[in-house]
Amino acid sequence: MPELPEVETVARSLAPQLQGRTITGLAKLDWPKMLTPSPDEFAALIAGRRIEAIGRRAKWLLLSLDGEWTLAIHLRMSGQLLVAEPETSEARHVHFALDLDNGRRLIFNDQRKFGRVHLLDRQGLAALDAVHGPEPLAADFTPSALAERLQNRRAPIKALLLDQHLIAGIGNIYANEALWLARIHPLTPGAMLTPEQINELHHAIRHVLQEAITNQGSSLRNYRDGYGRQGTQQEHFNVYDRAGEPCPRCQSTIERIVVAQRSTYFCPTCQITMQQPE
C-alpha cells in the first residue's frame, strides 16, 4: 500500500498537471462502490469545479476544489492516479476518470478495486482530518510530541507506528526501516522507550520518510507517480523484505516475525528486545 512518501510524490507530480484546471465532467465509473456520494450526485457536484490545489493528509490525496469542496482519494493497495489522454481510460483496470478542460483525463487505475474516491464538503474534510494523528514531517511533530503519543502505550512500538490515529502516514515499509535505523526492536512496548530512544526514533522516522520522498517512493508492485514513473526507494531498503540477508550495519542475519498481522523485519543483534513494563 502506498504510504506517506508515495502519496506525497503523487501529489507533487500531479500539481503542475492539475492546478488551475477545470473538471468538465465524470468520464468513467465502472466500480460505483469506490465512490462517495452516489454517482449521480457526484457527477452533478464535480462538473465545472476548478482544481485550486493538490495536497495530502496521511495516506489520502487531496484535490482542493472551488466552492469549498475537496476530492479525497485513497490509493489503497494497487491504485495509480495519472493524467493521460482520453483513450487511456479505456484500459481494463481504469475504473474512474474525470474529464479536464485541456482535453486530458485524470484516471484512477486500480487492479484490485480497493481504492476510494470521496467528494467532501468542509465538514467531511474536517472529519477525515480528525481521525488521523499528527503528520510526522510537520514542524510541530517534535520528540516531545512523539513521547506524548506513546505514553502509557503497552502495545509493540511497531503496531503503534502503524496506528493512523496516533501518527499519520507511516505504513509497514517505513515502520520497519525507521525502527532499524533507531536500533529499536519492533516488539518493544511503546511505554518502555527511553527519552534517548524516542529522540532516535523521531529522527529515524523523519529521515526515512524524507529519503523516500527524495527517491520518489518505493515501487514494489503497482505504485507509480502522476506521470507513470516508478520510485527507487526500494533500492535503499535496509531490512524491509530482506529476511535471511545480512544486516547492513552488523552483518547478522535479518529475521522476519509478524506484528499487528504485518510482516516485520529486524536485526536481532542491532535491535535490542525490551521487556514489558509491570
UniProtKB/Swiss-Prot annotation:
Q: Which reaction does it catalyse?
A: Hydrolysis of DNA containing ring-opened 7-methylguanine residues, releasing 2,6-diamino-4-hydroxy-5-(N-methyl)formamidopyrimidine; 2'-deoxyribonucleotide-(2'-deoxyribose 5'-phosphate)-2'-deoxyribonucleotide-DNA = a 3'-end 2'-deoxyribonucleotide-(2,3-dehydro-2,3-deoxyribose 5'-phosphate)-DNA + a 5'-end 5'-phospho-2'-deoxyribonucleoside-DNA + H(+)
The transmembrane residues are none
Could you give the cofactor binding note from the entry? Binds 1 zinc ion per subunit.
Ordered alphabetically, the record's keywords are: DNA damage, DNA repair, DNA-binding, Glycosidase, Hydrolase, Lyase, Metal-binding, Multifunctional enzyme, Zinc, Zinc-finger
Q: What is its EC number?
A: 3.2.2.23, 4.2.99.18
Q: Do you know which PROSITE patterns this protein is assigned to? A: FPG_CAT, ZF_FPG_2
Detail which positions bind DNA: 93, 112, 153
Description of how the protein assembles with itself and partners: Monomer.
* NCBIfam families in alphabetical order: fpg, PRK01103.1
The UniProt function text for this chain reads:
Involved in base excision repair of DNA damaged by oxidation or by mutagenic agents. Acts as a DNA glycosylase that recognizes and removes damaged bases. Has a preference for oxidized purines, such as 7,8-dihydro-8-oxoguanine (8-oxoG). Has AP (apurinic/apyrimidinic) lyase activity and introduces nicks in the DNA strand. Cleaves the DNA backbone by beta-delta elimination to generate a single-strand break at the site of the removed base with both 3'- and 5'-phosphates.
State the name under which the record lists this protein.
Answer: Formamidopyrimidine-DNA glycosylase
Q: Which organism is it from?
A: Chloroflexus aurantiacus (strain ATCC 29366 / DSM 635 / J-10-fl)
Question: What gene does this protein come from?
Answer: mutM
